[in-house]
Amino acid sequence: MNLHAQDIPNAANFLPGPPSTLSMKYVNDFADYSWGVDQRSTSRGTQAKSDMGWDLDDFLPVYSSLLGVNITKNNTPNIYQVLEQLKKYADLSIELSRNSYYNKRPYARFDEESLIPDTDDKYANVSCYPSEQATYGWLLSMLMVEICPDKQDEILKRGYEFGESSIIAGYSWYSDTQIGRDLASALMIYIHAMGGFNQLIKMARDEYNTKSSRAGTRAGYLTYESLPNPVKYLPAPPEDQSVLFAYDMNQYNEGRSKRTTDRGKQAKSDCDDSMDYICSIFSSAFGRTISENNTPEIYELIHRVRDLANQSCTVAKEHYNRVRPYVRFHDSTIYPDAEADLADNGSYPSGHAAFGWLIGLTLSEINPSKLSAIMNRAYEYGMSRVIAGYHFQSDVDAGRLTAGAAFARLHIESEFLDQLDKAIKEFKGGSSGVRGVTADEAASSAPFYTLGGVRLDAKPTQRGVYIQGNQKKVKK
């Protein structure tokens, strides 16, 4: 599928803007800024200063250390190339989002010095919505999970910390980092919708396996035991004495006040996690009626990822066993029918937020032209859990990140990719079956792509390097 600049995700189209300075969310932002200032004289502050890069080469030493492979343009050209392209798309997406919203950086708002004062003047009037370090860190880490799945938890943890470092440095608010990571998930949709980019990722993974002397990852359909473990890469739920928990409380009370409104009615309906309901709420945004009869391949794909997303939260739910808000406060929810069944089920992360977000990511890859509408509905599906009283806000936020990590991991699993291919063919009106072909047949008949991932309608006529199948082709 050919994608253009106008297709690049804009956070403002499906995510909330910066918080009002009169809101509890801003109070949480300010508290996190103050925490960050306190961290600057510690070892975490030293790491934060090192993390504050703006170019791709600034991030690579971290991943090189994690993987035990020196990632450079000369040593790992395939890995470098795919990361370089990804960074370019991230820059465009961040710029597009900032054209919609301006948020003044913390150090500039308070007329203070940041952790890296040499660049303060340069970035003082550049919006921090969304956080570039959070976007880059989470995006590069999700892609590296596809290249190096054996290190997935360590990679994701480090990717999360890049955003945290920008808070410590005084360059981003906490809310900016949340937007940045969610935007990164949408960017993964964008690159996967370009078939040529998938070939570049495959070449990068093969290069990693060669350089690290590792065997390729076993093909198959991912089980939840192999999914990234959120206990290892996400922070624990907020402590009761923290400002973040105060924000959780504020969101819970605000959500409770909406239960008699139209948004409350939607939240009550969203408590339905049946396949029929999920398909119905995404059909409008998707642009086609999704059902077992009308779109059997898409339906099957949604069914599979819904279950996997739920399972991706299981380890963290059992590990933290966070008490749900309605149980903790001896309160009622908007949908009493599920209260008894979920009373002993851990609240963190939110399974509903996770599978809603993962379904949104998957449907957007099938129809990227509807990305903003689909992902906005996925976001609101998760927010309904706060209004309903079944989850705290931090549970829902963690659910989206868990889904993003699972989305990346799924893209190296052959059964998922085969079902995704069937779903895309079904959406385009072609046969839902996939004809078996030999490797030579596939390579010779495969379309050509530019190194930027743009599919060509015919064989290239201009000189340059192209991708066909899993191979580079040079047109002289």
Would you name each region that the model predicts?
Residues 3-172, 182, 190-200, 206-388, ...:
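Hydrophobic alpha-helical bundle signature of multipass membrane enzymes
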Residues 430-452:
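Residue-level detector of functionally pivotal "anchor" positions at catalytic/ligand-binding pockets or at interdomain
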Residues 460-462:
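Surface-exposed, short loops/turns at beta-strand junctions within beta-sandwich domains
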Residues 465-476:
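C-terminal tail/sorting-segment detector
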